[in-house]
């Protein structure tokens, strides 16, 4: 309880649901799946923890859903769908459901890597290329990664967005980062946390990902910040992620942390230190100024 506000103190101004899969007694029948997504979407339309923007309500792809179900969910504002948690015999069976969700105007995210909940299956590169979703969730593993040989295939044989997550495999995260940039596909790289999960609740999960990808690679902190902000905004079609007239006034102020050998936030990130977050604004409103609870 209260973890989203704590994430705001970790510099995260927007959260996107990976579906409400852990709701106790979660329904898996088609009508129940739609009802859960709509309820989550409308609840967070009315609730902004600490001022954070929360895009909740992702329809969980389950057998029996029809185009009518997706259209009704979309009519009520649901624009996210999630594959990987349904009771399908094979991940290949997701394809028609992915297409129905996309036809309804939804962005489809797909669990990638080893199975994470009972009744689900590992999802590999073959499955992703068959489904053609919009986003490969935690492509570096959530937390178990798909085979290394699948990464260049996803990068070179599709336009699927590549989500690197904190709660995954750091070796494959760095490998995917290098491969995507070398293939001139940086715009498809997005950062996320994939938390809370069994890995834990990580208010600093996003900034930790930015720091690790910058300090353990040859790439600049500016690029890693772009993967966490503007690239996410472009992939999910959000009015955030850029300092530009007409965009949402969601901004954090950061500096080198007390005691760091670095003198700027960017230098601290490249050095491997978490920057100090001094203030956060959403919708132009200061949510805290002076010091974050978590940095």
Name these PLM-found stretches:
Residues 12-13, 47-54, 76-78, 104, ...:
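Short coil/turn connectors at secondary-structure junctions
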Residues 249-295:
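C-terminal cap of metal-dependent C-N hydrolases
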Residues 1-2, 32-39, 95-99, 121-125, ...:
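Charged helix-capping and loop-helix junction motifs
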Residues 1-52, 61-76:
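Alpha-helical scaffold segments that flank or form the walls of functional sites
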Residues 78-200, 217:
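Active-site core of metal-dependent hydrolases
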Residues 178-257:
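His/Asp/Glu-enriched, well-ordered alpha-helical/loop segment
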């Amino acid at each position: 309880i209260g973890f989203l506000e704590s994430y705001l103190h970790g510099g995260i101004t927007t959260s996107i649901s990976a579906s409400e899969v852990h709701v106790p007694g979660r329904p898996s029948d088609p009508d129940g799946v739609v009802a859960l997504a709509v309820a989550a979407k409308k609840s967070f339309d009315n609730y902004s923890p600490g001022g954070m923007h929360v895009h909740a309500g992702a329809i969980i792809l389950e057998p029996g859903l029809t185009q009518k179900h997706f259209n009704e969910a979309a009519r009520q504002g649901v624009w996210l769908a999630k594959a990987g948690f349904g009771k399908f015999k094979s991940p290949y069976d997701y394809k028609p459901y992915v297409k129905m969700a996309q036809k309804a105007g939804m962005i489809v995210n797909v669990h990638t890597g080893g199975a994470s909940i009972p009744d689900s299956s590992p999802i590999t590169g073959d499955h992703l290329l068959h489904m053609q979703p919009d986003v490969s969730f935690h492509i570096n593993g959530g937390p178990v990664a798909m085979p290394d040989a699948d990464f260049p295939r996803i990068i070179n044989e599709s336009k699927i967005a590549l989500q690197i997550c904190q709660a995954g495999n750091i070796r494959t995260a760095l490998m995917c980062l290098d491969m995507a940039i070398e293939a001139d596909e940086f715009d498809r790289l997005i950062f996320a946390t994939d938390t809370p999960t069994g890995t834990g609740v990580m208010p600093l999960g996003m900034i930790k990902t930015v720091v690790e990808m910058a300090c353990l690679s040859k790439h600049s902190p500016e690029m890693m910040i772009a993967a966490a902000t503007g690239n996410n905004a472009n992939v999910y079609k959000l009015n955030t992620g850029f300092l530009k007239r007409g965009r949402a006034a969601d901004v954090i102020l950061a500096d080198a942390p007390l005691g760091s050998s670095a003198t700027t936030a960017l230098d601290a990130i490249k050095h491997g230190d978490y920057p100090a977050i001094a203030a956060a604004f959403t919708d132009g409103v200061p949510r805290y100024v002076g010091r974050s609870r978590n940095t």
